[in-house]
């Protein structure tokens, strides 16, 4: 059996067409794009032949933000983020200048739903790559959405901005 793995781009977040908001914070959140991709990374050309763009990032603007507010980014009906093969890692670039956040990915598939904690970042100006490597690879999963929980809000007036870029998975056969 081969141990070869490949990284596949699920979304480069150049537009918001594939996503909608859900969860407790959806009514306080606006989804848009911003002319800033993660500058500290070089856009990759992934195993599926898709090249990541770095012109725009997906942005969640949260009004009246407070600690423990949760916003979900879910795939729009008819939009599929199927992961062929065995999921070995999920990665996401994140920048959150106004709040500390915790991010997780929600997966579905033959074996039911599960949530993978991608990680936490403190409020700051820099892009950071979050990721999760499950103990055992997950076969034939679908990425259903991302959950973002604000853990500490440092900006008290206006909207809290959370930027997302290049959602990728590493798969094995």
Task: Explain the meaning of each model-derived region.
Residues 1-173:
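Beta-rich carbohydrate-recognition modules and glycan-binding surfaces
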